[in-house]
Amino acid sequence: YEIAQCLVGSEMCIRDRDTNTGNIIVGTIGQSKLIEQAGIDISALKNKKQAFMLAVSEDGKLVVAGSDSHGTAYGILEISRLLGVSPWEWWADVTPEKKETFRLSGKFRELQSPSVEYRGIFINDEDWGLMPWSNKTYEPSDVKGEIGPRTNERIFELLLRLRANTYWPAMHECTLPFFLTKGNREAAKKYGIFMGASHCEPMACNAAGEWKIRGKGAYDYVNNSPAVYQFWENRVKEVAGQEILYTLGMRGVHDGKMQGAKTVEEQKAVLNRVFVDQRGLLEKYVNKDVTQVPQVFIPYKEVLDIYHAGLQVPEDVTLMWCDDNYGYIRHFPTAEERARKGGNGVYYHVSYWGRPHDHLWLSTMSPSLIYQQMKQAYDQGIQKMWILNVGDIKPAEYQIELFMDMAWNLDKVSFEGVTAHLKHWLERELGTSCAKTILPVMQEHYRLAHIRKPEFMGNTREEEKNPVYRVVKDLPWSEREINERLNAYSELSETVEKAASKVPADRQSAYFELVKYPVQAATQMNRKLLYAQLARHDKEDWEKSDAAYDSIAALTQHYNSLENGKWNRMMDFKPRKLPVFNRVERNAATAPMTADRKAACQWNGAEAKKGNAIVCEGLGYEGKAAEIRKGDALTFSFGNLKTDSVEVDIRLLPNHPVHGDKLRFSVSLDGAEPEVIAYETKGRSEEWKENVLRNQAIRKIVLPVTGKKSHQLVIKALDEGVILDQVMLYEVN
């Protein structure tokens, strides 16, 4: 059965080969007589978008009814899910298990509809993965950088299997733009995919790739607006009739500031003019009632400052808020923004190229963090559009599915929790026996990477003026901390190696792609850089670091050879060829290693003796962070100490304010006057960069201690969004 057929047809009847009698009826309400005659109540589908119903009729037929063409497609693919077929059947080689029979109760009835209207992915930073794989391996082309319709149809099928509907195509200069590639537009139409574009691609124009081909002069709306206007106009005319979510506004040709306007006020004036002109094009070529054309404005990076300076975005345009590229959403809508007709969206990253350091390789974003931030986003009214920057798709398979499952049915994911969601995913992909062993492995893998991502292990930074930031150097960890981390990774790697025997033969490639490569590559990356750190201090052999580098290369070579070379060129362990990915240069330390410091007491946020801690499942350095609601407090108790003062280290998630621009808490010891502490960061400040790399915001305060036998440390949230990870108590000599 052709998946795309249910997006262009109105009804069908799947027949038994032997009896030629239909036992599955598929159709869209209002367009299908078969559905109307099936004898099931479909009233619940009316006035819903993208919804479907599966029900067994009185005569024993399975009826698949969609509220529209998308709903019908999702309904068909729900049968596939019920049969145990993974959405990653092709993309991660999860071979379907053959079944002779499949039974449903005569009372079976399933109704589903999305939590978020537009749900999709952004292919980005494709230079070292998806583009060369598509262009040279899967869909060989003589046209440099072409990602063609054969590749995109595979992506579109995956989106439908994930119950997604929106696509932002790859847009780097290395890639031939989507709309300039023959067959791509038609493929999107065939699969019913809404085409969108990123923050620097207004009016469906990939400025980075297209301006040099189709533009004239500078991409500057102050000094060259006629040429830029014509550039946009040509595209809008070309794609008439295509389902497009138009991005409004303007930045630089790629991920940079607007040209021609220097101050925020000047940029605001240009954007006001841009809005008028862009919406005029939509009125002229798409719909005279421009409010009926889906449009989105994305205040990303410096554009958020322009928005906060009073930029007026048309009421019907969706406002799409962004994370800071490392998983923490920068702005949640105000009550006024939530009330807008256009609604609110979010653009979220599990892959990123940029300051302070890329994370393009292993996709280790904590599922618990994704859940916490996206649940908060939904609760704060971000319910119109969710887009995930997925890099090359692989190896972000699990994060993508978690994100899409939340966008489809947030209540279900919220009810079962992240641990259960991951467990069910592993069971489907690898089988129950293997999943039982691998679940704690993947949880620990994500926890260790939350502390510090594999790409950050060289203590380097990118896109800084001072070249010293690119030199691999010691992390501020003691020898004990390093050895504990090495041991933890060794246990993971050994378990993964042994568990392979529990995986069916036809799922071995899936196991390598989804578990073995990410876990063992992360293990070897940590070994490479931590053994090098120890070797700089004459505490280990350099050969161990070199051996780890060789292991990463061998693992990657094996990945690219899987399934007779199906994935050749997809995996590159040196994206952007950054220093951290190289063999570590041998040199001696010029400063002593960080000394070990033992805390007199330490707690995780969830370990408070008193208070209304909202435990964030699996989140934080030890997976026990806790949110403190505004006005609530947590109390930590400790006994007498032989000191007259203590240093309290409060370690929090480095998230951003939920309401307003403040993120504050207070600290009080034994009923003393509370000390108010703020920890919000601004832009890409030095503190924000440090917070990103260590995944904690840290505040330290010294407090006097009386001679009491027991003490009470109280931490109170003064704003929404305070998430306490750890508290460390040190005696002050």
Walk through the language-model features, giving the residues of each.
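The substrate-binding groove and active-site-proximal loops of carbohydrate-active enzymes
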Residues: V63-G66, D127-P149, N165-T175, E210-A227, ...
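An acidic-aromatic substrate-binding cleft motif
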Residues: W88-K144, R150-A170, G342-G345
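Hydrophobic or amphipathic alpha-helical targeting/insertion segments
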Residues: G60-V94, L180-A204, K216-N234
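Structured mid-domain segments that build the active-site/substrate or prosthetic-cofactor binding neighborhood
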Residues: N165-W168, T175-F178, G183, W321-G327, ...
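Short, small-residue-biased leader/transition segments that mark boundaries at the very start
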Residues: E2, C6-I14, A547-T594
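Extracytoplasmic
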Residues: D572-N733
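Gly/Pro-rich turn-and-neighbor structural signature
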Residues: K99-L104, H172, F179, A187-K190, ...
